């Protein structure tokens, strides 16, 4: 909330930050949703906001589309059964380009495989065999898919090569046990690039250099109505964590900065 209040103040009187009980919206208001869909029961005015958005009385962003809050979409991109669908919907060129950017992703489903079958790319016949992989072979990362209070801030992220064997085994077991309520995905871990960054220390009034690792998050906005609607790149957020951090998120030690597009 402090960050949003600061941002609204920089933008002028047209923008205000309201709490979870505010319902006095006016027709045509643009509302930024600063809560996730898993948290609807804890946001008193959430149902009112969604009702007004459905009636097109207000413009709501991000749109309340659960698919965009689930990482398992990445696993569906790699699912061979859906390749024809993706080619038809995305086009062959963009489909291949997207697969170059998205790491191979598996949905961790505890359903038993036939004795002669194996998990694609992994060569394992049971998810529990992940637990016995050597640290060198555990260059894999488990992530809770979404729709959970553990799905942000790296709370539900487990990097195999960074954990002891017992801790990694416990993470695998938890992922299997939580499948019906909070599914996990497994991805190959790609080490983020190292960059030289700087941040401004307001206490010392000086610029401080910081070697770090960066994550880029593009923000797309839908403009136009109905058939004329299209996605437009609105900006890119760079999150730069200290170089010794292996999982990038908006931690207190991170630099969060807009990028030039």
Predicted regions and their residues:
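Domain-scale recognition of functional cores that engage charged ligands
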Residues: 1-261
């Amino acid at each position: 909330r402090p960050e949003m209040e600061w941002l609204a103040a920089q933008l002028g009187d047209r923008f205000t930050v309201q709490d979870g009980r505010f319902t006095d919206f006016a027709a045509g208001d643009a509302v930024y949703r600063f809560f996730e869909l898993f948290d609807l029961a804890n946001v008193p005015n959430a149902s009112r906001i969604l009702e007004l958005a459905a009636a097109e009385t207000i413009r709501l962003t991000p749109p309340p589309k659960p698919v965009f809050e689930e990482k398992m979409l990445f696993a569906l991109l790699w699912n061979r059964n859906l390749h024809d669908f993706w080619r038809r919907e995305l086009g062959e060129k963009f489909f291949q380009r997207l697969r170059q950017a998205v790491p191979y992703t598996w949905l961790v489903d505890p359903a038993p495989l036939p004795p002669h079958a194996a998990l694609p790319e992994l060569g394992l016949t049971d998810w529990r065999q992940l637990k016995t992989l050597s640290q060198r072979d555990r260059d894999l990362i488990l992530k809770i898919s979404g729709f959970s209070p553990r799905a942000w801030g790296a709370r539900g992220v487990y990097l195999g090569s960074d954990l002891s064997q017992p801790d990694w085994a416990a993470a695998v077991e938890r992922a299997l046990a939580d499948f019906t309520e909070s599914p996990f995905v497994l991805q190959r871990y790609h080490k983020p690039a190292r960059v030289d960054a700087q941040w401004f220390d307001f206490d010392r009034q000086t610029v401080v250099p910081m070697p770090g690792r960066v994550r880029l998050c593009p923000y797309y906005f839908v403009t136009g109505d109905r058939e004329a609607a299209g996605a437009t790149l609105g900006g890119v957020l760079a999150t730069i964590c200290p170089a010794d951090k292996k999982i990038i998120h908006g931690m207190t030690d991170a630099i969060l900065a807009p990028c030039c597009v």
